[in-house]
Amino acid sequence: MKKLIVSFALMVITLASYAQVYKMYSTRNYHNQLRLNTMTGEVQQIQDDGQSWIICSAREISGDKESRFCLYETQNMWTFIMLDTYTGKNWQVQFSVKGEDYMFAAPINIFSLAYPEATSNWTNRFQMFATQNMWTFILLDSYNGRLWQVQYSTQDLDNLFCIPINKDELGSDNEKCIFSIQPLTSMYQYYLINDRTCLLYTSPSPRD
């Protein structure tokens, strides 16, 4: 009986660990889901008949931080944006039912916007927010208030970019999220909020 209890406990621990490393994302095609390795950034398309394909190979092969990578759904049903929440790097990830030639991961921003150390244990440092322009997201460094406009495209992969909106740090030496974004009534503006001081900053929207 004791052996059975120990075996069951080990199984529960293993499943919990798996759930923390791997995250499943539903898609608007009910036959397919995406499985993300949140440590490495590997993305697999999982079909309900048991078939699977690697859409995006590991971006951080030696990654050991759970929840470092995440996926953001776009208004295009076949496209997600993958974000490295430690560095701000991001990729356009596309799944498909037409075959592997239509599955890919294309880099949008390949440059590190922050430089974690081996001991860094950041949580949701970089975050993305959808805008009313379906092709555009706002990328926020929630530790210091820096902002970028991120654009994806399903027609022209040369039209992917990540450009700064606000390069200036509005806070420093923070090891947790203190900035957040809230939309204004105007579709062209938003509030950047310092949750520690309650200061509000307004900014124009991303370009059309």
Language-model features, listed with the residues they occupy:
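Cleaved targeting-peptide boundary
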Residues: 20-25
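Conserved small/polar residues in nucleotide/adenosyl-binding loops
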Residues: 201-208
